[in-house]
Structures are given as C-alpha cells and as structure tokens.
Amino acid sequence: MANVSIHGPTGVLVVDGQKVFPIGLSDPPPHDGQAPSGEHAFRELANGGATMIRTGTPNWALGRINQQIAKEKTIQDSAAAHGLQCWMRLGPAADLPGAAANAQILQKVVTAFKDHPALCAYKGIDEPRNPFRGAKWIRPAGLVRAHTRIKALDPKHPLVIIQAPRGPVSQLVPYRPAFDITGVDIFPIAYPPGLHSDNGNPDISVVGDMAYKMDEASGGKPFWMTLQIAWSGVAPSKAAPDLVPRFPTLKQERFMAYQAIVHGARGLIFFGGHLTEVCTPDDAKAGWNWTFWRQVLRPVVHELTSSQLRPALLVPNAKILVRTKPHSEVELAVRRAGKFLYVIAVKRGGSTLLVELLGLPKRQNGAPLTKGEVLFEYVQRPLPPPPRPDRQVPRPIKVSGGGFRDWFSPYDVHVYRFDLS
C-alpha cells in the first residue's frame, strides 16, 4: 500500500515519505500495450517522467462490480509493475446518497483498492459545476458526504475534484469541503481558439487565468491543472463533423505547463492521448498518441522531472520579491531549494522585449551575486570557433546590482538558477 498525503507547506504529494510533484496522463495507453520504442507502454511513460495515470471507470455498476474491479486490478497491477501510480475514477458513486447503489459501490471500490500499491488518489465526479449540466449540476452536499465516507474507509489517499473552466469562483467555493485537492480542465487550442473557457481570453495564457481562479476557489488547498493533448473540441464526430484537429506545439505545451506552475499548480495532468480518432494510423492501432508524446510531451516532462529543476517544484514560493522592469507580461515564480535560487519566468504574449529582472538576493556569505544560468538552454564555453561539442553548458547570465537583463518573445519560458553558496 502506498501511503499518500499532502505536504502542507507546498501542496505536493508525499508518497511513502517522499515528496512528489504529480505528472499524470488521462487516459493512458492500454495497460498491455507497447510503445514504438519496444518498451511496455507504462514503462515508457514512467521512464519519461510521468508519475501517474487516470484509471477506473465513469460507470461503476453494482451488477457487474466484481468484473469491473477485476479489470481495474489488472491495470493497477501493471502500473505498479512498471513504475506508475493510479488516479482512480469513482464516477457518480462519489455522490451520496445519489443513486440507490452508490453507497454500496463506493464501499466496494474503495475497499478493493485502498491497500493496492499503485493507488495514488481518488478522482471524484468530473466537473460537477459545469454549466453544460444545466439544472442537473451536481450539488456539493452529496460530494461532501462522499468525501467523509471515503476518508473513513481510506484516510491514506486524497480525493481530487476537477472543475470545468466556466462559471464564477463563487460557484466553486461551496465544493471546498468535498475535496483534498481540486483543479480545472483547460484546453485552449482549437479552431477557433478559446472555445473551452468562458473568460474571454482566447489565448493560451488563459491557463494562467484559470490557475489564478482555482487558487482562489481552492480555499488554500492544492490544485492541479489538466492541460491539453487533445479534446472533444478538436476531434470530428457525427455530432460535429466539421471540427479540425489541432494540437499544442512544443512551445505552446511548454508555456502552458510552466505558466500553470508559476501560478501555483502543484500537479499537472495531460489529457487526450487516448483520443485515437485524431491520431496517426499507427498510433490509433496502438491505442495512444505516441507521436505527440515523442514530439511534444516527453521533452516537457523530461525538463519538469530533471534533477536540475525537480527540487524547485517541491518547495514553497520563496519570500523574495523579484520583479521586472519595465512592466511587462513576464510572470514569475521564485523558489529556494538547497543552495539554489530558481526564478521561473514566462511571457504571456505581447511583443519581443529586453526585460530587466531585479531583486535578487546576495549570496549566503554576503557577497553579491555575479552570475546565474538558464536551465535547458545551452551554449558552448569557451565560445567558438572552433566548435567543441564536449563544451556545452547552460546559458550563463551576468548579474549586477541584484539584477540582469534577458530577451523574451511571446510564450517564452526561461528557468534561471543561481548558486547562493
């Protein structure tokens, strides 16, 4: 059994005593599938940095509960064997009293998996306050009762409720007692853009807007952001035959992930790899969008889980006021981990600017900072010519008077690291 709790100062998960910034895939490849590399599908994801997958079913039914539990156990066994954990859907059963069988289903499912080594967290009813539910939106009271019951059955795994990117914060506040972690789905890329949310921002920077909204709605509890691989708004169907497939580029996905982190997200979920109707023929046969994983998602996840950056995702925001001059659309998060200070900077949009960042502290010995580095951006030192392939280092930054200048184009991400020792 994995003992999973929430780290109070940060909101990240603590899994068997180790802090984890969860990176999940919803839904994953088939549990018995194979990646194009030849690896087991789940092992490929774990090796690439993913920590968990969404599992479970949205329609647990008492009449076939034993078969459903057996199927879920096979998936969780495979996840555990290949280095992944599971975020298990409870579906409508996580609403009490709800349907007559809900309480029985909830007890059977939670009891069946609460001691499974792959279980990471439970997923409550999806988007309970989505305006598209109309008058049938899910009232908080039943979800609060379900949360209480789940915690009585299994106090060692959190319950997560993800909301829709629509409606005011005031509609989400009543759900606070119903979850341990909340979050939001936000899929801004489509033709035309901006269809998924209702806040009027058609740009990919709507991710930051939604993160800000969930930070307010959460009441101090942690939140995750569910970001786009694909979604129903880019997948043609009989009901919407004229939709045109569209996916985030590497730059867009990287920006959305880092902007979510800058605005406080303590976990990221990537949705839509299982929508085979918009995959290549080979990926459709394999049951998952391995092309997107290879070209876009794996490079982003590799950065987030790297030894250079990972420590910064597991600590609170530092109480250091780093600011930009002139005022720009650059958004910042400042973290202190060990001897390093991290400044994660993203540019929402606008024009290309040379931006000054000010407010860096002195080193631990009182001496001023004179240099830093930009992670994941590489240059040769000493400078060429001649080219020396064995001399690539992170791009250096010169610091003077507690500040430095750097270029930002729209949707740029720069991850700065400074050695304070």
Predicted regions and their residues:
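Aromatic-lined carbohydrate-recognition surfaces of secreted/lumenal glycan-active proteins
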Residues: 87-95, 144-170, 218-234, 270-273
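Aromatic/acidic polysaccharide-binding cleft in carbohydrate-active enzymes
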Residues: 241-300
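N-terminal carbohydrate-binding accessory modules
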Residues: 1-46, 151, 160
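Carbohydrate-binding surface patches
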Residues: 324-364, 411-414
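C-terminal beta-strand-rich structural cap/linker in extracellular carbohydrate-active enzymes
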Residues: 398-421
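Aromatic-lined substrate-binding rim segments of carbohydrate-active enzymes
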Residues: 37-110, 135-160, 198-207
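Active-site clefts of carbohydrate-active enzymes
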Residues: 212-251, 278-279
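Active-site groove signature of glycoside hydrolases
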Residues: 105-139, 164-172, 176-190, 267-269
